[in-house]
Amino acid sequence: MTLQFALLIIVSIAAAVLAAMKWHAFASADLDRLRQQEHWAGQFSRGARVLLNDDRVPKPLLETLARLNRYLLDPEACFLLYNVFTQPRGAAHPFTMAPEEIALHETHPELAHAIAETLFAGLMAITYTDLRWGERARGAMARRYRGEAQVTELAVAAREVVRSDH
């Protein structure tokens, strides 16, 4: 009877150790997610603050920044973002920019780059609102924008941030 009791104690201890290891792995992954979300939300916040004070930024873009800001803490936004990036691209129809956006890109390329970085940071922050859907959303974004120069440059910078965090 004492051998069975000792075996039961050993099995219980092993199960407790395995459960603690699994919990630790989850907690570490969630802590990494929160660090990344804090980084990208900070980047977005700094960029948005600069853009809000710039009179050259079109009003529709400011409204987009406000919408992104609302989604920063919404885990459902991560799932919705995943759905957007996994939808097949429809029939190619011409993309047209508003005249004020064209003028902005032509006359103020540095501002256009700041806008792109801020929007990218906002999207990245949203992808870190949920551990599981965030990984899927980032993967879908990478597949969708593979090879596009500016997005690739920003993604490399994002990868460097992830590496420096570990």
What are these language model-derived features?
Residues 1-42:
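N-terminal signal-anchor transmembrane alpha helix of single-pass membrane proteins
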Residues 46-81:
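Acidic, Ser/Thr-rich low-complexity segments on the non-lumenal side of membrane proteins
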Residues 69-70, 82-83, 162-166:
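Membrane-interface module
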Residues 69, 73, 90-93, 144, ...:
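Short alpha-helical interface elements
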Residues 76-92:
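Short, charged early-sequence alpha-helical segments and their helix-coil boundaries
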Residues 41, 45, 62-66, 82, ...:
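Generic detector of well-ordered alpha-helical segments enriched in charged/polar residues
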Residues 95-166:
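Cytosol-/stroma-facing membrane-proximal "stalk/adaptor" domains immediately downstream
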